[in-house]
Amino acid sequence: MNEETGIPDDNLLTIEQAIANLQSEDLGLRVYAAWWLGRFRVNVPEAIDLLIAALADEADRTEAGGYPLRRNAARALGKLGDRRAVPALITSLECDDFYVREAVAQSLEMLGDNSCVPYLIELIKNPNPEASADTEPEHPYDAFLEALGTLGAVKAIPHILPFLDHPIPKVQYAAARAMYQLSEPMVADQYGDRLVAALANDDLQLRRTVLSDLGAIGYLSAAEAIGNTMAENSLKLISLKGLLEKQIVLATPPDLTDGAIRVMALMDDLL
């Protein structure tokens, strides 16, 4: 345990060693240190500064053009919750590494700073018209859409709507998730119902994606469908936990809402 931060050290690194390793010439040590600092939520100024600097790293690049250190730094900065990282993360949305852009969007979503919204909207404005379910997307559109939904970017709605018909299913689901979050209650349910219908997909990985989306939006009408989905109980429980958390907010202690009681009964059945 580090006495100043209260953060537990693991058997391989201490906080001081991780910070030192992030400045090492050994690229492997730097990549691991960036991951470690995020994993253990080492929210100290020196770590934040070094991770921000790592977003511009040019030394660690794969033959395919990827930036492993930048990816880990971006992921860590989202977990650490310091909004000083937002400007550098926004700049990193221009990185030509798909997975850096994905990690950046996810971290901007976690940080909850709306200053990134105009940049995310620009990135979804002109999707490739020749995209198909069999080709890799040019951008991590699902991550962009999820961030816009979480950030309450209502002005992005006209640009999100076309993605409901995107050829890649998980992008469709991300669009439905965002539209549920951004729409008025009287129309939001149609997007939640789209996700419920997608739980019947033959592809297990896509069913897992939808479970995550339904948990994120806390769509109560999906509760029974989640419980009956052909997927791992652990994932169904995580999804139902998302629904339960939404219901807890609506409750007046010590009472629970009927929805919370309903979800808890379903969770008990899965344990």
Curated annotation (Swiss-Prot):
The keyword Lyase applies. Its EC number is 4.-.-.-. InterPro entries: ARM-like, ARM-type_fold, PBS_lyase_HEAT. GO terms for cellular component: phycobilisome. Keywords: Antenna complex, Lyase, Phycobilisome. It is an enzyme of class 4 (lyase). The keyword Lyase applies. One of its GO terms (molecular function) is lyase activity. SMART domains: EZ_HEAT (SM00567). It comes from the Bacteria. Belongs to the CpcE/RpcE/PecE family. CpcE and CpcF associate to form a lyase. Required for the chromophorylation of the cpcA1 gene product. This is Phycocyanobilin lyase subunit alpha. It comes from Pseudanabaena tenuis (strain PCC 7409). The gene is cpcE1.
